[in-house]
Swiss-Prot record:
UniProt-recorded name of the protein: Elicitin-like protein 2
Keyword Transcription regulation attached: no
Keyword Signal: yes
Predominant place of localization: secreted
InterPro entries in the cross-refs: Elicitin, Elicitin_sf
Keywords, in A-Z order: Disulfide bond, Hypersensitive response elicitation, Secreted, Signal
Role of this protein: Induces local and distal defense responses (incompatible hypersensitive reaction) in plants from the solanaceae and cruciferae families. Elicits leaf necrosis and causes the accumulation of pathogenesis-related proteins. Might interact with the lipidic molecules of the plasma membrane.
Pfam families on file: Elicitin
Regions crossing the membrane: none
Disulphide bridges, residue numbers: C25-C91, C47-C76, C71-C118
Amino acid sequence: MFSKTLVVLAAVAAVTVNGLTAKECQDAFTGEVAKLTTGALPLVQPCSSDSGFSMVPPTGLPTDDQYVKMCASKNCKALLEFIKGAGLKDCELNFGSIFPGSVPLNVYQLGQGFDAKCESISGGGSTPTTAPPSGTTPTTPTTAPPTGTTPGVTPSPTTPKPAC
């Protein structure tokens, strides 16, 4: 547990900017270290085991396959709910100095976009359409537009345009 705490503290020291100044990112994460250490770290390994996504060290954003597994995992849902509620700022954590080959990860964006990503992967979010039951006719008559020409309107000649 001590090594994971050390990793989080080192990551906080390696915050990079995404829309905020480096100082704003540093200040925002410094205040959240204790909450992240005690609340998120116990869920990181179980979520990684469930999904195959490596958050520490990060190797990129989750793939669609990893998101499918994360969206189905109680551990990952709990982790992302905790992250969403932690009050983090929109900044990236850069683990590169600790874990060569890792990439910066914006934990805030990962948390905030999690539910929408799960919906898009599961096909949710679309509004179902309802059709009238088969064998029935609509109760409201429909009127087709008139065919032919409209009185008082003379159609203008058209000239074919050359193909591009």
